[in-house]
């Protein structure tokens, strides 16, 4: 796997975009999910928050109406590959196809911005090269903003992790699909008002990237 110190200087991979604007980008991986994505959208609407959803192609095939809903409500989507293959245990050819099949599929919905997030955050030479040549900005997350919600650690654990570590320019990693995400939804209902009270505005990743120097 390639390391952050190798990837960051290329300008093609982003973990966060520090700035003075009190803005945070909340991202959701592994959806869309017919149970949890609508609940997430309801909360985002309630707090006038924009977000970015890194979707898996095969889940979009099952729930195409949710992509329309996400986009209609002013959020953005990114390619989280077609089948969620990990660079840690897949061949270069399979990884390349998974990214490019996802790209082809997501182009039906959105042409810009071209955002990609590799499953598990794993990036090897094949993933980096394929994403770069496909025109993607690869988006990971702030290392201090992974509350491991996918492991269902408890609502308060998720809330405390995100709120206590919040800094302007953060990219927060949450999940709206792949399993029982009721803890994530319950945590989001507390995270949004708390950070709003602290003066934060919730933006899409592409808006956050405008602050990148």
From Swiss-Prot:
Assigned EC number: 3.5.1.104
Cofactors required: Zn(2+)
Record's protein name: Peptidoglycan-N-acetylglucosamine deacetylase BC_3618
Activity regulation text: Inhibited by CuCl(2) and ZnCl(2).
Extent of the signal sequence: none
Molecular function (Gene Ontology), one example: metal ion binding
Keyword Zinc recorded: yes
Catalytic reaction(s) noted: peptidoglycan-N-acetyl-D-glucosamine + H2O = peptidoglycan-D-glucosamine + acetate
